[in-house]
Structures are given as structure tokens and as C-alpha cells.
Amino acid sequence: MRKKLAPAAVAAALLALAIALVGCSSGPSDEEVIRQGVSEELAAIKAGDDELISSVEEGAGEDLKTLGIDARDFMSAYLDGFDYSVGDVKVDGDSATVHLSITCRSMGEATEAFMGAYGDALANAEDLTDTDALYELAGKTLLESLSATQPKTVECDVQCQKDSDGNWSYADGVSEQMSELFLSQ
């Protein structure tokens, strides 16, 4: 798709992958084109592909590095248990609705767990006056909190639109909708 579907966020970074969904009159139906494009995009997220990792590194790599966390390790922990299914695709002229079922960890829930666990770790830590040691403790606690957060399944509908060239893309607002889903579900 042309517009990006932000599947996950790390701090201020939204993770995005783009796939062009090009429909042609003699090829597959609009429903098939949309289903294939959405499925390929979500499969790339599930696999933690290099484009996804690069997106995380670009958006939050320095913050993760400060905590002693590699972007690939972070995404591996976040995506553990990630799954999806593409349900009904309903096309109505130049617009379409795609029903998705997504199973993933909630970044909001993981952050909340981290705050409590890090506070407890600081209260129980002795002689942690070195800034690097504090960051290392925060990084370790963040990964543990993320790994302890259980994946949840949520259902949502996303809107797609066809342009004048016959190409399908996500409608305006889908990126924000998916970011909200991944951050707070």
C-alpha cells in the first residue's frame, strides 16, 4: 500500500512498512489485491523484517542504545506472540473495509509494568549511583516487563481507498488508528 500502516510504536517512533497494492483489470479482484497486500505487510511485521528493524533504529535507536538494548532484541521481545488474520474484505466502489484480528503485546501495558518494576528495582538497589548502571537496570527491566506482558487479540476494521490509477492504499487516519491499537490495546 502506498500509505504506511504503523503497527507498533517505540516511544515516539511508529513502525511502518509500505506495500503497493496495484489492481489491474485482468488480474485478481480488488478483494484479493487488498487481502494479499495487507497479509504481506502483516507477515513482514510478524517476521521482524529488516525494514521494520531499521524503522525502529531510526525512530528510537539512540534511546534504546542508551538503555543497552539492541533494536532487534527489543522488537523480538515485542513481537513474540504476534499474530494476525485478515477477515472479510468488503469493497464498495473506490473504498474498502478490511476486518483484522491482531494479537500483540500492548506497549501501554508494558510501559505501565515497567514503571512499577523499575521503581521497585531502584528501591531495592544498593549503591547504584553510576548513570550507566541506572540505564542498564532500566533497559533490563524494560525488556523483562515487555516479555512479561501477555499478548491480547483485538479486532478492528481498516479503511482502504482506490486512487484514479486503480491503486489501493490505506485511507487517511489508518496509521493513527493502528498506532493507538498497538500502544494502548
Residue ranges, per PLM feature:
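Core segments of small alpha/beta cavity-forming domains
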Residues: S26-S85
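Beta-strand elements of well-folded, non-transmembrane domains
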Residues: I102-G108, K162
